[in-house]
């Protein structure tokens, strides 16, 4: 089972240095409150370190991934994911099997842009952010690494 990282952009583009903008484009996070799911690797960790003041990330569990996938829509028809859509496009029998294959690393969500609209668009967190978005999470802020607590933020943003 591979570790999946949920990455959410929490700050806008005004005043962003060019190299951070390029990194955010590579991570496919063009706007505020966009989210992507990647497998944990050294190249992704390097990009996260560069773009740290503009994003927050952590390890996804199965519940957090299911919540994120509820916001995923098909490219053709703008439909939410159902078992019928998964059968016709990806030849996968059920939604739960789809989630399991992503968690096991058999399917990479960021490579399914032929079928789905990526990045995943989220709402601002209900109740607002608990800290300042220009402070690290470790100092009662919002940006940077937050571990398993990313799932709580996703729950509030879906």
UniProtKB/Swiss-Prot annotation:
It comes from the Archaea. PANTHER family: 60S RIBOSOMAL PROTEIN L7, LARGE RIBOSOMAL SUBUNIT PROTEIN UL30. GO terms for cellular component: cytosolic large ribosomal subunit. Keywords: Ribonucleoprotein, Ribosomal protein. This is Large ribosomal subunit protein uL30. The gene is rpl30. It comes from Sulfurisphaera tokodaii (strain DSM 16993 / JCM 10545 / NBRC 100140 / 7). InterPro entries: Ribo_uL30_ferredoxin-like_sf, Ribosomal_uL30, Ribosomal_uL30_arc, Ribosomal_uL30_euk_arc, Ribosomal_uL30_ferredoxin-like. Gene3D superfamilies: 1.10.15.30, Ribosomal protein L30, ferredoxin-like fold domain (3.30.1390.20). One of its GO terms (biological process) is maturation of LSU-rRNA from tricistronic rRNA transcript (SSU-rRNA, 5.8S rRNA, LSU-rRNA). NCBIfam families: PRK06049.1, uL30_arch. Belongs to the universal ribosomal protein uL30 family. It holds the Pfam family Ribosomal_L30. GO terms for molecular function: RNA binding; structural constituent of ribosome. Part of the 50S ribosomal subunit.
């Amino acid at each position: 089972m591979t570790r999946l990282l949920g990455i959410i952009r929490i700050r806008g583009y005004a005043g962003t240095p060019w190299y951070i903008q390029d990194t955010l484009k590579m991570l496919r996070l063009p706007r505020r409150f966009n989210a992507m799911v990647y497998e944990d690797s050294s190249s992704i960790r390097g990009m996260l370190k560069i773009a740290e003041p503009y994003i927050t990330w952590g390890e996804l569990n199965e519940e957090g991934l299911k919540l994120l996938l509820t916001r995923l829509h098909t490219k053709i028809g703008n439909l939410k994911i159902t078992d019928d859509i998964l059968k016709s496009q990806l030849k996968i029998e059920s939604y739960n099997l789809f989630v399991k294959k992503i968690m096991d690393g058999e399917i990479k969500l960021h490579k399914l842009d032929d079928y789905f609209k990526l990045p995943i668009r989220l709402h601002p967190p209900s109740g607002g952010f608990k800290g300042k978005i220009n402070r690290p999470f470790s100092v009662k802020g919002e940006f940077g690494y937050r571990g398993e607590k990313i799932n709580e933020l996703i729950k509030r943003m879906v």
